Amino acid sequence: MDGALFPHKPPYPIQSKRPPPSQSSNQSIKFSSATLHLPPPSPPSFPLDSLLHHLVHLSSPPPRHSNSAAARFPSLEVSTDSSSSKPILGIEIENERNGSLKLLCKKEVVLVNSIVEQPLTGLSRFFDSVKSELLRTDLVSLVKGLDDSGHWERAVFLFEWLVLSSNSGALKLDHQVIEIFVRILGRESQYSVAAKLLDKIPLQEYLLDVRAYTTILHAYSRTGKYEKAIDLFERMKEMGPSPTLVTYNVILDVFGKMGRSWRKILGVLDEMRSKGLKFDEFTCSTVLSACAREGLLREAKEFFAELKSCGYEPGTVTYNALLQVFGKAGVYTEALSVLKEMEENSCPADSVTYNELVAAYVRAGFSKEAAGVIEMMTKKGVMPNAITYTTVIDAYGKAGKEDEALKLFYSMKEAGCVPNTCTYNAVLSLLGKKSRSNEMIKMLCDMKSNGCSPNRATWNTMLALCGNKGMDKFVNRVFREMKSCGFEPDRDTFNTLISAYGRCGSEVDASKMYGEMTRAGFNACVTTYNALLNALARKGDWRSGENVISDMKSKGFKPTETSYSLMLQCYAKGGNYLGIERIENRIKEGQIFPSWMLLRTLLLANFKCRALAGSERAFTLFKKHGYKPDMVIFNSMLSIFTRNNMYDQAEGILESIREDGLSPDLVTYNSLMDMYVRRGECWKAEEILKTLEKSQLKPDLVSYNTVIKGFCRRGLMQEAVRMLSEMTERGIRPCIFTYNTFVSGYTAMGMFAEIEDVIECMAKNDCRPNELTFKMVVDGYCRAGKYSEAMDFVSKIKTFDPCFDDQSIQRLALRVRENLES
């Protein structure tokens, strides 16, 4: 192995030995805090105050109006600038262009003008003041008049007032008014407004037309009110009017979004066939989208094959939906075959087609290939859009390739593709993970200048970034600021909070937030369960994790690849290797789909448990499915081979890194140094360290600890102290592992006086010795037969650390007595 392996990176040393310097040259080097150039403790890694200040400043809270519909119905966030952006009507019947306005009588024209002249905040009071006049007016014509004149928001506020009056018994709503209202809000995509107001209307008392019912079904689907949609659909079939093809497509969408409803979807399809309704592209794409959400690859392929066998010719929309199935699962080979079939059938690919291909590559770990799709699209005359770029940027961020992500972001802007809020959120997330707060602030400003104000998802991103141990107070603060800026939590927010508290190690807060979520009217979904699993994975509580999985299944939810990945993490953290094996066997038996993420987690779980055989099996399984390992996988395999002295296999991993065109990172070189240290070639390890110091990959604490460990194992304590001095000169503070390595080295050499120097140095530098520190010293005395010295050392532990645990001292004293008696 030589420098040719990675020609553009720090070369590996070719020197096999380096004679130690003469002892006389090292006499002056002594372990002492006076010889160490310790830097001050690092500041907090995430300066939240400054970042939060900018986010609050840039966030524009949604307007609140005490007398508007939004005040009584928080979901009624319709446009509030209509009074300034729309001209006030001075309606003259004879020259009005809108046909419906010509039908208004003079009294109704005056009323329309009066409504238009009122500020939105004063509409409720105005309606109350002209209540008797409104009740004598043709309300259908009045609502149409407001809508046709461009003031649909005022028509909605009028309808809201009518609903309140109807509930108080002052009037009976006309079914035509409801139909017009539903059409207006459907046209304007105001589904949450529609769903909120419709909850106040006893729909069972009205018979509406099929178009209105279909729009209401769509509103329920968009707002997650699936049970209401299903009840309404069943009532339509029982009472009329008969559902149309569009209605059936909407109810298919309802079942697809609701989840765990594949049999019901098949039942709806059979019902459509029995009524002679021919499937269109929306039917097919909706069914395939349902498969994508649930990971139903086999069902999707069977449904698509059946369609074609019946003579159906898929169009771009249907093919895109099929691509989404494979894209979500990361099965890029199937996605490529779909793209090939489209070309063979002369079916034009659009930006959505390529976006799904990008998603497939990303899910399979091929971020470079995903970026290559952008060039492919351009050559074929299809311009990549914000979704395309955002998907790849997010993939780079998750792979730890922040610089590539930022480079692509700026290339996106240069190409004339305007980033959207999702793009900025992805960039903010990857910058936050690396604590690059100054760049985050610049990105927030850039976001605002491009007309993308921070939204709820931006705040959710900020909450997620606070999910580190000990940062639960920061989570609380960000959540308070989020609400003060007018962003009420949605289900995604609650899921993010549960996950963030879990990562902070605050399982109590995570459970509390789950309770708040249900009280707020949000039902748990797969993401919620995964957030709970994430909290349990941090603690290794695999028993509770298994209960969560059982609860999911009992409620009809199908655990996803994320669910099983988190269970693997639970087992790994909890040391339950048999649990890892059970999931591995289910994957091999075909019960769980072997996605890129799941197999990657399987390998990492085995690595965490130091299970060599399990890691090798997972690595073989990973490559068997055609997935591309990332540097985390390669580094894990390199490390476990090194730990087990399997140097030929370790060199094979290094060769695979080169063949895959990947760049070794600092973790790779740290593992390589560890390999040399384990072989006793500490000088080679130092050569790599010296080369790293001159490269862009600057050595870290692990790098120096590894070389120090090598020298200590060889008894070259003066060289180890020299490395420690160089480390601190570079601004890297030693940790407990560093000090314990010196204790171990001095103990092996019988240099007990120096050990006390190390412990005193630890105390001076705010690094408390742990039980292992003292245990190594006690064992060293015992091995040397110095039992009385060992007991003397135990008796003065409190002088080194007055807060050291009494039970630990008793255990150490017992250890000395047991050694003496053996």
From Swiss-Prot:
Give the Gene Ontology MF terms in alphabetical order. Answer: mRNA binding
Q: Which domain of life is it from?
A: Eukaryota
> Where's it mainly located?
plastid
Q: Where is the composition biased (Pro residues)?
A: 8-22
Q: Give the location in the cell.
A: Plastid, Chloroplast
Which residues are listed as membrane-spanning? none
Question: What keywords are annotated for this sequence in UniProt?
Answer: Chloroplast, Plastid, Repeat, Transit peptide
Q: Where is the composition biased (Low complexity)?
A: 23-37
Q: Where are the PPR repeats?
A: 209-243, 244-279, 280-314, 315-349, 350-384, 385-419, 420-454, 455-489, 490-524, 525-559, 560-594, 595-629, 630-664, 665-699, 700-734, 735-769, 770-800
Give the matching InterPro entries.
Answer: Pentatricopeptide_rpt, PPR_P_subfamily, TPR-like_helical_dom_sf, TPR_rpt
Span of the signal peptide? none
Where is the segment annotated Disordered? 1-42
A GO cellular component term found in this entry reads: chloroplast
Gene3D superfamilies annotated for this entry? Tetratricopeptide repeat domain
Q: Where is the transit peptide?
A: 1-77
What PANTHER family would the database entry show? MITOCHONDRIAL GROUP I INTRON SPLICING FACTOR CCM1 (PTHR46128), MITOCHONDRIAL GROUP I INTRON SPLICING FACTOR DMR1 (PTHR46128:SF329)
Give the similarity note: Belongs to the PPR family. P subfamily.
Matches recorded under NCBIfam families: PPR
* Entry protein name: Pentatricopeptide repeat-containing protein At2g18940, chloroplastic
